[in-house]
Amino acid sequence: MEKEKDIAVELGRDAAEGLGAKKYKPLVYIVAFTAALAGLLFGLDIGVISGALKFIAKAFSASTLQQEWVVSSLLFGAVGGTLISGIISKKYGRKNTLLIAAVIFSLGALLSSISTSIGILIGCRVFLGFAVGMASFTAPLYLSEIAPRGIRGALISMYQLMITIGIVCAFLSDTFLSTYFKFHGIVGGHWRIMLGILIIPSMIMFIGVFFLPKSPRWLMLKGRKKAARRVLSKIRNTEEEIAIELEEIEENLEEKQNGWAMFKVNKNFRKAIFLGIGLQLIQQLTGINVVMYYAPKIFQAAGFGSSAEQMWGTVLVGVVNVLATFIAIAFVDRWGRKPIMYTGFAIMGISMCIVGIAMPSHAELAAAAGHIPTRAFISIAGIFTFIIGFAASAGPIIWVICSEIYPLAGRDFGITCSTATNWIANGIVGLTFLTMLKGLGATTTFLIYGGVEVIFIIFFILWVPETKGISLEKIAENLLAGKPLKKIGL
């Protein structure tokens, strides 16, 4: 009887999201875009530090280690922001957590821009990191709980798209402020303005999020079924669709334990937690933020000597990153998550190896006497193909999968663990790259990053599920029923 009921629910859900429901309400896209502005703030900070670092180092006579800490301090602050977000988000809601993050981001940007020493700047960036961590935790979670299942992958991918747009906007701003802008008679190098200008988008995010509806799943978690129905009525097409979704959420809420309690006693939930941790480790160990944080230094290592060449090359990196993200948005709900990931890892692995092999040595650059060797152009081409591979796959899709694989009662805990892992790994990458580049050389450093992509393909084959077109509640049901991880999306 229970099996027949499940079949009936599946048939009803398919009918509700059938041909007549292919067109989604415009409000769905407006809500998703506004929530994804959290990704814009994240991207702006990744991009802005790339261009500002050279001038910060000059202003404070910062050592290599201090420069690494300027980059990584925000990332370790983001770990703290992520860890407290699970508690805040569950108690006060996804929307309110995003509002708090916007306020902290504004304050952090202001304080960073008026720092009077390298130590104070590092401390301010830790504070700013709390906001970035809170936003990176909450935005994909909110998007997954708002989105219809038929376009869930695309809408969550909008978060990564906004990250890439933020990066390219910051690169453009940095290029203008570092090369052309005249202030108090000084042309270029205005790192304080680079950092302080981030106040503007954080205020825009606050205003936009203020008008968003609350997550219907969070409302149901708080026993507010009528409010959840009202929200769903604005973003779903039919009463049948709303009724089915509410029924699924109620069934999922029959699991009364919280995330930590589930982790201690439920081995199936533990598997999902470790999968999420593994996925976020993978995203960072691809080496993407090596390129994003240190793009000007990579261009310099390749033989592009002038600041203008380095900054405009960095802008082009950001533009390619944005454009390639549209590949994931277009195909993640058509082709599925895993086929795109396999292709992306292959492209990234080959590209990093090309970068490592083709990167000219110091001796070659010295012998070139100011001319850029052909090998330098090959290595930079490898950087661009790597960006395409990442932006079309691991960039958005890992955020998608990590927002899908946890049951509602443990979703805050699960996303806390996976997102905190992302920031820890991100911080380690940011803190070690310049040291690796100096100690191992460019060739060995990039070959190491290229080699690990093969391991990631094996990881996806063995453990990662395909979640295309499956409701969050069905994925949770399969997980808690003890299905193997790679089959919880079937």
Could you tell me what each predicted segment is?
Residues E2-A227, V231-S233, I244, L253-L490:
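Alpha-helical transmembrane bundle of multi-pass membrane proteins
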